[in-house]
């Protein structure tokens, strides 16, 4: 069975009972220091591009075709970055109001909200009279079903794969999103590392759904081998994803489906009334049996959630967290140094860097991501002051000065809510020389220059934030002051040269 959660004194969401006095000191210091705050809405970063996608991307080859259309491997003409472009042909949608079109738009709207290292990232999208065009990450490793069919999967490999799936599920479930069609074919491999680790991402959010606490869904969704019993009964919640995760782990290891039955109807009876077949699991460890048993609990009220599943012994025994987040002490010191130097960045630069980080290749930001995950002791995607203090002390092997830790934390907590999230951390810790190249600065300029006039105006900034709950008069005023200070021609606009100098000024601190 899973580990019992220790009943600790939780402070500001840290999950650690450290020094309460230190937390109070930080909060007082935080209140005494004023700074403009901007809460980033992913819908701002991921937006529709009003142009022809083939003006921005060069097609390398077609890598997939289906009834929906095709998937093309493409290269961004400005940056040289490799992407996948999903071209969905509108003529293949039987009816403009059909479920298929709704699924496409649903996937787009859901993916725009999510930013997680184990979920396929969407960068931008286009639409014309004939097609939808979704620009996403390109993952060269194929789907997990293909890998499982051709490669043996060890216990530790399966544990690390499921650990990553659970991290992603924990993230989307906290956002009130359920996937509803989790299966091997919808998990893609980004790479297989030398130590045998498969790095994965969940994709295909076409049937995903926003839910409310306490409400049960009625519409059946998913693939038959992976559907939870309560889904067949048309009364289910987000825990249907945990059931699917249990099926995935079972199939990865045994190469067999967990439920008997010669056809779908008979298999459905086993899922609802009899449960999974335990015999193929007898050769595996107690840790494997424990977590699969609790993920494939037929009573969803008793089934564990993702946060609980992450505490199971299997992930500690196989050291999954450290295997996935292998980052050296030298790298950590570099990231801490970057964070210290990030403190004077203003709201305009922060917005641009957030956009560039979102559009970076995973290799460019993997180090800070690993460091964040290493510090995130309770794996809730947020790190409070005490959790940060204790994590740094554990990593460095000695206590740092409280003033130094408070200063570092202040630079990370840009939203001033007494914790920092992954986006805030990566933005501060990333190597700015990788992010602020000429090509990428041009890309950021294009992001702000919505009318493609070659100039950025305050009206375009207001337009950018129009649908955001974070459109704050103080933030807009700060943007205006910055634009005015950069506008050497006094025409209320800034050009690429002015913007480039403005962004490269960040590098002077590194």
Label the predicted regions.
Residues 82, 87-114:
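Conserved N-lobe beta3->alphaC-helix segment of eukaryotic protein kinase catalytic domains
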